[in-house]
Each structure stands twice: as structure tokens, then as C-alpha cells.
């Protein structure tokens, strides 16, 4: 065996270790949400691939919905963050950082404090948190966005993010930018515009 072959084997082994660590983070997210009393799936008792009605009891309960693009964009942003902070580190290490951030958000997002903030500051009056399935799929959507950003030119990634933001903003009058704005600094004008859907 050559030195190069041994180095490749070590690199592959290291990649697998980091990927298993990512899965471990997702497993901890799932367990934590279960211990928080979150429902596994929609209270309706079935699972849908897509929930297209934003103001419904099924929103944030199924595999994907209009907020899935926001989580893909999280992946784009976390890839950029990892590139800036951990430039010399392998992609799998940066993916672990992204997974830790996303999982921490998914847990925080489903606490009573954040759920109540959504209900009071945004148009999400009927929001009662994500199902564990939906939250897990949000984390996987982030990972997909992260991996996509790692393969695409920056200009293409930025273009996709802008298109996703504009499209969801047009269709449901909400997107990642508006969501963050309304959580951090709610504007009555934006809330009134969103309510006009």
C-alpha cells in the first residue's frame, strides 16, 4: 500500500466519522423534541409529502411545506459561514457545524417561548410548533442546501436563494427574510400586508 492510498483511507474514515456525528446530532434533536412532548407526526394521524396550505393545522407538520425553501437557504448560509470560519477543514466538519446550528434552532423554535413569539409577532396565529417529522426534515433540507452550495458556483447559489425568497414571498407573503424580520423587529405594515393573503 502506498502512502497516498493510506492517506485516502484515513480521509474516508474521517469523513464517515464526521457524517456519523451529524446523524448523532439529528438523533439528539429528535430525542430532545420527543422529551419536550412534541408530536411525532401531524395530529391528523397521517403524513403528507407536501402541505401547501400555510394557514392550516397541517403546516409545519408534514414532510415539506412552504418553509422548506427557507431551510435550504439556511444550508446555503451555513456553508458560507463554514467556508469563512473553517476554510481549511474538510466539508464534513463544516457540515457538522451547520447541523449543530440548525438542530439547535429546531429545538429552540419548538419551545413555548419561541412558539408564543411567532404567534404574537407574526401572522402565524395558529402556529403550535413543528412535528418531530417536520423538524427533522427541515434539518435535512438544510443539509441538502449545504451540500448543494458546496457544489454550485457562488453566483448560482445566490441566484437560487433570491429566486426562492422572491417566489415564496410572492406566493405566501412570507420567506426567510420576512420571518427573521418579524421575529426580531415586527412591523405592523408587514403584518398587515401578510394578513391580506
Swiss-Prot record:
Where's it found, cell-wise?
Answer: Cell membrane
Q: Which Pfam families match?
A: DUF2585 (PF10755)
Name of the protein in question: UPF0314 protein NGR_c32320
Q: Does the keyword Lipid metabolism apply?
A: no
**Which family does the similarity line name?**
Belongs to the UPF0314 family.
* Any one GO cellular component localisation term in the record: plasma membrane
**How does the protein's chain sit in the membrane according to the entry?**
Multi-pass membrane protein
- Repressor in keyword set: no
The membrane spanning regions, by residue number, are 16-36, 66-86, 152-172
Q: Which UniProt keywords apply?
A: Cell membrane, Membrane, Transmembrane, Transmembrane helix
Amino acid at each position: 500500500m502506498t502512502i497516498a492510498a493510506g492517506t485516502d483511507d484515513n480521509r474516508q474514515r474521517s469523513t464517515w466519522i464526521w457524517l456519523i456525528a451529524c446523524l448523532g446530532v439529528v438523533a439528539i434533536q429528535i430525542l430532545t423534541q420527543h422529551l419536550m412532548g412534541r408530536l411525532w407526526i401531524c395530529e391528523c394521524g397521517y403524513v403528507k409529502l407536501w402541505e401547501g396550505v400555510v394557514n392550516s393545522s397541517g403546516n409545519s407538520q408534514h414532510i415539506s411545506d412552504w418553509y422548506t425553501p427557507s431551510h435550504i437557504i439556511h444550508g446555503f448560509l451555513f456553508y458560507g459561514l463554514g467556508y469563512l470560519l473553517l476554510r481549511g477543514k474538510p466539508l464534513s466538519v463544516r457540515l457538522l457545524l451547520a447541523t449543530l446550528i440548525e438542530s439547535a434552532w429546531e429545538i429552540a423554535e419548538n419551545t413555548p417561548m419561541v412558539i408564543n413569539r411567532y404567534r404574537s409577532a407574526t401572522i402565524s396565529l395558529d402556529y403550535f410548533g413543528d412535528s418531530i417529522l417536520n423538524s427533522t426534515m427541515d434539518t435535512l433540507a438544510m443539509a441538502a442546501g449545504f451540500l448543494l452550495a458546496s457544489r454550485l458556483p457562488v453566483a448560482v447559489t445566490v441566484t437560487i436563494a433570491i429566486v426562492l425568497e422572491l417566489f415564496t414571498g410572492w406566493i405566501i407573503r412570507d420567506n426567510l427574510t420576512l420571518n427573521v424580520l418579524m421575529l426580531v423587529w415586527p412591523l405592523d405594515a408587514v403584518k398587515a400586508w401578510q394578513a391580506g393573503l
